[in-house]
Amino acid sequence: MKRQISSYKGRKLCLWQKLLLSAVLAGAVTFAGLFGAVLYGSYDHIQGDPRAMVVLGCQVMPDGEPSILLRDRLDRALDYLEDHPDLTVVVSGGQGPDEPTTEAQAMHDYLVAHGVNSGQILLEDQSHNTDQNLRYTIELLAEEGYDTTEDILVVSNGFHLTRVRMLWSRAARARVSATVMVLAGSKVVSV
C-alpha cells in the first residue's frame, strides 16, 4: 500500500485529468460566486425614503390563507408599516390553479385584518410569475403616478431578491434601491 501511494505522488497528471481538475475548480469558483451573489442579495438594503412598498405573492393555501412564506413577507411588511403608516402598498400575485383566490386578494385581506387601511393597498392580480409580478406592478405604479426609478421597497424572501433586483432593473430600466429580506418561518434553525 505504501508503495502505491508514493508512486502516485510522483506520477504526473495526464491531459484528461488536468482538464477534469480544471473543470471541477472552475465549477467551484462559479458556484462560490453565485452563492455569494445570492447571499449578498438576501440582506436588508433599505435605502432612501421609499414612496411605495411592493409585496410579491407566493402560494395561497386551499383555505384562502397565506402560506408560511407569504405570511412571513406580509408580517415583514407590517413591521415596516408600523414606522411608515402612510406608505402605499402594492400586493402582487394572480391566482394559481390550486388557489381559491388571487395571491393579491389574500394579501390584501391579511393586511386589512392586521390594521392596514384598504385604501392604501393597490392590487396587481394578473401575474403568474416573478417577471409578470414586476412588470405589471411597475405599470400599476406608473398609472398611479409613481416614478418607478425612485426608491421602491420590494418585500420577498432572501433567496428571491437577487433575481428580483435583476428583473426590476430590466422592467423599470432602473435598479431596485430598497429591498427587505424575510426568513422562511421567521425562525433560524441550527442543524
Go through each PLM region and give its residues:
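A structural signal for short, hydrophobic/glycine-enriched beta-strand patches
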Residues: 35-190
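N-terminal type II signal-anchor transmembrane helix
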Residues: 4-45
